[in-house]
């Protein structure tokens, strides 16, 4: 079984080797730029870890793991545009390097690419994987809209906030684990347990993230916040 660090190295190498050879370059250069920014790669590593619980050779899951990371970065690209953020991981955001329209269109392309990568899995698991991935993508949109709605309210209840972070953050971590388990041949019970674990982990991460955003010294905690 591989360590998390070993799996991180593997998926980083795989993503670094991606070639976007289609044209126009004005669409695909921002995609390559976003993926070159790095990051913790938590979601693909979780998928590989879950798969590795059941299968030794993790290479068959590189494409779906790449899909989950491309999807995550697509959401960040559009988040940065909506928030008018100038920096992401210490580098200028896509709408600053290029423009708003390019950020929208390249983000859309990343969403399609994420589905293409995710679909590169064995036929016997394709429907279950794509159903879960599609539901997760929709739930993330719902969570983002809730977050935007809450910015206009001063009466947000605790249960509403928890539901928002479940949708906005937790479901993708949970899906990463469950997809890895399904592809590895896990039982339905095991896959669901890993999903629940990912859900709880995501809530814990987002609670910490939000606390640091409110109370943390950015100079000290920048490397800790955001997953």
Where are these predicted regions, by residue range?
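N-terminal amphipathic/basic leader segments beginning at the initiator methionine
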Residues: 1-18
